[in-house]
Amino acid sequence: MRNLLPFFTRIPVKGDFERVRNELWALPLLAPLTSALATLVLYLELPLSNVLAILALYFTTGLLHLDGLADWADGVMVKGDRERKIKAMKDLNTGIAGVFAVVMVFLLQVYSLPLLPFYALYLAELNSKFAMLLALATRKPLGQGLGAYFMEGMNGRQLTLGTALYLLLLLPVAYIEPRSISSLLGLLAGAYVIRLSLRNFGGLNGDCIGAVAEITRAGALLGMAVVWVYFGG
């Protein structure tokens, strides 16, 4: 798992670039690490803890996936053929669609957290990391970037191990609080992002995978918030 840290977090450790694509199965294991600081903020109930928790999360994960979300949204929303959409996604300038997507994801997370228990971000991050694994498992790369490199290492064994690990980390929480299962709604959002990416671009690159991660997390928090509000104990 150590080799994943430099590529998916800001945690200052060295990783082996040659080995990382063979350890993608461990992506769900990153969730306890990436959500730890944010979960602590929520547990301590600090003033503006919902905002501080999201800032703590991005302090840990970095903004690379959020940047990918902006690029992805620009590409999806532009009118035209596939070539034009890919060109818009790769444009260094962020358009209004990208700005809107980033703001909406940020606000959905910030305003969902006050309605949820302190461990909600852990569940959202767990689903986010698993959704990234599912995106890589499509093995339909767009271009020859880092996403394509990771996809080359994906296989059935890694997906099976990753799924087992995901369930191992999810089910104990769901046993204690059954409503935690509602976090899986985030996976539906992530699956829709994968579908949109394949339809608009014909494959997935790092920007698409970043969008999957961000939208899955926001979708998980939103889904849980709805369930907690309407099915609260």
Curated annotation (Swiss-Prot):
Subcellular localization(s) per the UniProt record: Cell membrane
Pathway connected to this protein: Cofactor biosynthesis; adenosylcobalamin biosynthesis; adenosylcobalamin from cob(II)yrinate a,c-diamide: step 7/7
Spans through the membrane: 24-44, 46-66, 96-116, 117-137, 158-178, 181-198, 209-229
EC nos: 2.7.8.26
GO terms for cellular component: plasma membrane
NCBIfam families, per the entry: cobS
Function: Joins adenosylcobinamide-GDP and alpha-ribazole to generate adenosylcobalamin (Ado-cobalamin). Also synthesizes adenosylcobalamin 5'-phosphate from adenosylcobinamide-GDP and alpha-ribazole 5'-phosphate.
Protein name: Adenosylcobinamide-GDP ribazoletransferase
Organism: Thermococcus gammatolerans (strain DSM 15229 / JCM 11827 / EJ3)
Organism lineage string: Archaea, Methanobacteriati, Methanobacteriota, Thermococci, Thermococcales
